Amino acid sequence: MELTQLINSVSSIQITGNIQRKDVADIVYDSRKVQKNSVFVAVKGFNNDGHRFLQEAIAKGAIAVVVENNEALPDDLITHSQIAKILVKDSRKALAELSKGFYKNPTSTLKLIGITGTNGKTTSAFILKNIFQSNGYKSGLIGTIANYIGTEKVDAKLTTPESNDLNKMFYEMIQAGCEFAVMEVSSHSLILNRVYGLCFKTAIFSNITSDHLDFHKSFDDYLKAKKILFDNLNNSSFAIINKDDINSEQIVKDSKAEVFTYGISDGADYKIKNIIYDLTGTDFSITYKKTDYKIHTSLIGVFNAYNAKHPHLQQLIVWGLVQKK
């Protein structure tokens, strides 16, 4: 994709310098990975600031740089280097927008399911991927333990990778023939705009407890972070929430998605009951519209039954509703 076309993807404040009619080789936020004809996005991190490495990126052949701080790169250096400087309000959002454009908006094609919550994300994501695979649907996974592009395992460095890495992996999933993608969505990634612009078909809320307050500072901030995922769903999406968690209604309060609830609580759309476990695993049933669905999992214990029920609900809900749309 030409730079002249790609810059239309980003919400810019000002563009100066030379916008070259060249194909962009890559979008990068790590100056060590800059190659000729890359676009370098200067992102402020916790320990480093990408604005410190702008000149290094230019020296390595970047044809454009994206900055939040207009003073980080003098205009005379831009003129001398014959590159473009793109000033934005939020570099992380710009990285997501550029990556989405560069990789041809891959989540508009994939059926993307996001799982968020303090507990149960990893177990639910892996079981759900296996459900899709066992039914003949090739799928990808983004998670804490590992990422998968179909059956190919890719090492995971973060629970939810940066937006550029996410869009690249989703693009690769499509190339590999994947129809579904399941991902863990951390609260950190929601605040840091790593999942900004992704098209989620379904979002699942497991629960929320007073963890990660070192990052979010308060429980209210933590709750607001989780809520971002559901606020950004459109009216053709689905939200699946744990009715047993007292914060579940707050999570979907402003969501446009169709909402389904699950849990042991009365009034849940999908009511969990009759949980029995022994050394062979756990049995329970899910009742929906007066019909009982019996479930068995090799995971042992009430807690693991709670984890297991999320993906089994997907088998009942996502399996039917996502494909219907």
What does each model-found stretch correspond to?
Residues 71, 90-93, 207-211, 264-267:
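Short, acidic/turn-prone active-site loops that include or flank metal/cofactor-
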